[in-house]
């Protein structure tokens, strides 16, 4: 039987809550500064005689709250409680693992990991320098390519004289031979790359009968290292190597250069080239742009030049390649080719790069870099300008590395699709169909079946921003996951298109923590550790892009991460103090998860200016956990009915009827609500007390409903269960408190887009409830709980086994997550920070419950390491 989607459920499940007394969104209450506020204080004296007195503060006056006959005081000892009519019942406490992040542990870690305060002046300098890099992005910055320069230097003078047309390029070759006799990227060594560049340079010098010393040194280098190619992995071959290298070997032989032509590897690659040349579909070669245009210099004997000219790019190049364009010019004399080469040398002076322009590639990767490093908030204008530029060149078949590039690149296209969609641009996933073959597999370029890890990683990350019904994105997800898992099994899993510091680490993180199961600060920490400021790229030759791989990005990211972490540590210490002063720390039926809760919000809403949002969210979540545990561990339904009644009436005079543990819970909630209301009024410019109370009433009624189910051993229908449980998970309640403090003044219309009336909130609660139940239902069933999504689904569908029902629940959850993504990415009326808070709550639930009950069992699970890395361990 097909699992119903959330939309089919919504016809049965009311998203609005009508069973509580109605409140307008912001009902008119008196000024919140006059609201009575209770707090607990400890008298001095011995521990045996310490009394915690309840005080009512009205303005500057402090009076003892009158309860029954005289003042009520709360003692830490139950035998001193005056609860004659309602004795404290025995609670059915669950056996929770004790909290790990106690004050002594936190202090110990923080003292051993102290770092110097961030140099604010250095931070500002780095921000300014990176902004200048963004503003300076034109057609792309890249390093010289000895290989391409050698091809440009081969062009003879147009006047027929025996000289190169671009003599400065020949001089560059003569002056830039490396000490070992090779040419190429000095700080990175790949045998294929060095031998290719060296062979091109010694051929060009020989053609112009100059640089005999350099030629001889180059030949010696070639002889010494040629056999090493056999041992270097195939995926380290530059693009088109199998065509251009054998072609140059043949040319070197015709020039009588003393090279090891009889090496088995060289003979083998020449044979492979001959076989591949026969398989090139000539009809495809001349009708549509393919990657073959990138290395035409290696296909000269089969190319019909008058036909290939029809595929020339608008800028006169052939796929932005100086070498390929130079080869076409020498065979055709095409003036547009010459114009392109003049354009390149006007930019670089005496050398040519591997390809140029690279404007789209550079902008996308720079944006991706600052976003993944967690420093994008400093560059909002620059990012917007870069993405507007990308979008202006977006095509229905994707984009390549340059605006005039007629051959789309799957890596650039996938990154562009993901980043543009995440930033609110309207882009279709249909562009990915360009890169799919008849077997449903994805390739990097038209005309090439090879794939690289970086390309497939970008495609995988792109697939996670799919909208419902985008089958090509789902296919991309499955294809890339299979490819990337296989790549990880290879000990030498490197990449075809680049030399990255830790591509394995990037892939492992992406597969283990996909976008919906990650959080921004967690990803930033991971990428800071994996990012390589000196990474190189591999096209036809190796090159470096300084606006993508730059130590300034990493330095700023580290300074910023550690600075933000130090702010979060101070906030956590204050929250730990509040946890104790509220009395919650003394309750033995609840879970101490202050650090884990704070981690969940600090990993998302991490900016220093959102301190109040973090504080309110954390305290509200703590209070919710305490109350949830209270209702789960209740001694009698009557007690919690009394608690609910007190909240509805907001009546302090019900305190004398409450057992001690319920008094602590009520006072904690009462003080917190008033605290939030006071601050909320300042931020929103209107009274929010009624709004906040109404949210708590809705929340507690769902707790009450579940307690009644538990008491009666009642298993509701799946629809009835979801109606209550998607609210009791508390996501909407917590988020709706937090959004008041995101820096936005929220209208009733904005709130209606994210509160209980909205699809957004419903999906958030539904996905949170379902992932929670899948990981907790067995343990809770063992403790006597009978209602969970799995058990309720099995009640409706007795033909399903437990395992089958669980699969159905996962299917429903994934469908709801897909719908939630669409709401997040398409919502236009909701401020970004409000959307983030809603969406990242859902992501945090997926993270915490990814492998089990990562909240209750947090001290024994991977969440513990996440908390440590984000909150306590500075980046070295």
UniProtKB/Swiss-Prot annotation:
<dbReference type="InterPro" id="IPR050148">
    <property type="entry name" value="Terpene_synthase-like"/>
</dbReference>
<dbReference type="InterPro" id="IPR008949">
    <property type="entry name" value="Isoprenoid_synthase_dom_sf"/>
</dbReference>
<comment type="pathway">
    <text>Terpene metabolism; oleoresin biosynthesis.</text>
</comment>
<feature type="binding site">
    <location>
        <position position="632"/>
    </location>
    <ligand>
        <name>Mg(2+) 1</name>
    </ligand>
</feature>
<dbReference type="GO" id="GO:0000287">
    <property type="term" value="F:magnesium ion binding"/>
</dbReference>
<feature type="binding site">
    <location>
        <position position="632"/>
    </location>
    <ligand>
        <name>Mg(2+) 2</name>
    </ligand>
</feature>
<dbReference type="Pfam" id="PF03936">
    <property type="entry name" value="Terpene_synth_C"/>
</dbReference>
<keyword id="KW-0150">Chloroplast</keyword>
<keyword id="KW-0809">Transit peptide</keyword>
<dbReference type="InterPro" id="IPR005630">
    <property type="entry name" value="Terpene_synthase_metal-bd"/>
</dbReference>
<dbReference type="InterPro" id="IPR044814">
    <property type="entry name" value="Terpene_cyclase_plant_C1"/>
</dbReference>
<dbReference type="InterPro" id="IPR008930">
    <property type="entry name" value="Terpenoid_cyclase/PrenylTrfase"/>
</dbReference>
<feature type="binding site">
    <location>
        <position position="772"/>
    </location>
    <ligand>
        <name>Mg(2+) 3</name>
    </ligand>
</feature>
<dbReference type="Pfam" id="PF01397">
    <property type="entry name" value="Terpene_synth"/>
</dbReference>
<feature type="short sequence motif" description="DDXXD motif">
    <location>
        <begin position="628"/>
        <end position="632"/>
    </location>
</feature>
<dbReference type="GO" id="GO:0006952">
    <property type="term" value="P:defense response"/>
</dbReference>
<comment type="similarity">
    <text>Belongs to the terpene synthase family. Tpsd subfamily.</text>
</comment>
<dbReference type="InterPro" id="IPR034741">
    <property type="entry name" value="Terpene_cyclase-like_1_C"/>
</dbReference>
<keyword id="KW-0934">Plastid</keyword>
<feature type="binding site">
    <location>
        <position position="628"/>
    </location>
    <ligand>
        <name>Mg(2+) 1</name>
    </ligand>
</feature>
<comment type="function">
    <text>Involved in defensive oleoresin formation in conifers in response to insect attack or other injury. Involved in diterpene (C20) olefins biosynthesis. Monofunctional enzyme lacking the DXDD motif in the class II active site relevant for the cyclization of geranylgeranyl diphosphate (GGPP). Requires (+)-copalyl diphosphate ((+)-CPP) as substrate, but no activity with GGPP or ent-CPP. Isopimaradiene is the major products of the enzyme followed by sandaracopimaradiene.</text>
</comment>
<dbReference type="InterPro" id="IPR036965">
    <property type="entry name" value="Terpene_synth_N_sf"/>
</dbReference>
<keyword id="KW-0456">Lyase</keyword>
<keyword id="KW-0460">Magnesium</keyword>
<feature type="binding site">
    <location>
        <position position="776"/>
    </location>
    <ligand>
        <name>Mg(2+) 3</name>
    </ligand>
</feature>
<dbReference type="GO" id="GO:0010333">
    <property type="term" value="F:terpene synthase activity"/>
</dbReference>
<keyword id="KW-0611">Plant defense</keyword>
<feature type="binding site">
    <location>
        <position position="628"/>
    </location>
    <ligand>
        <name>Mg(2+) 2</name>
    </ligand>
</feature>
<keyword id="KW-0479">Metal-binding</keyword>
<dbReference type="GO" id="GO:0016102">
    <property type="term" value="P:diterpenoid biosynthetic process"/>
</dbReference>
<dbReference type="GO" id="GO:0009507">
    <property type="term" value="C:chloroplast"/>
</dbReference>
<protein>
    <recommendedName>
        <fullName>Monofunctional isopimaradiene synthase, chloroplastic</fullName>
        <ecNumber>4.2.3.44</ecNumber>
    </recommendedName>
</protein>
<dbReference type="InterPro" id="IPR001906">
    <property type="entry name" value="Terpene_synth_N"/>
</dbReference>
<feature type="transit peptide" description="Chloroplast">
    <location>
        <begin position="1"/>
        <end position="64"/>
    </location>
</feature>
<feature type="binding site">
    <location>
        <position position="780"/>
    </location>
    <ligand>
        <name>Mg(2+) 3</name>
    </ligand>
</feature>
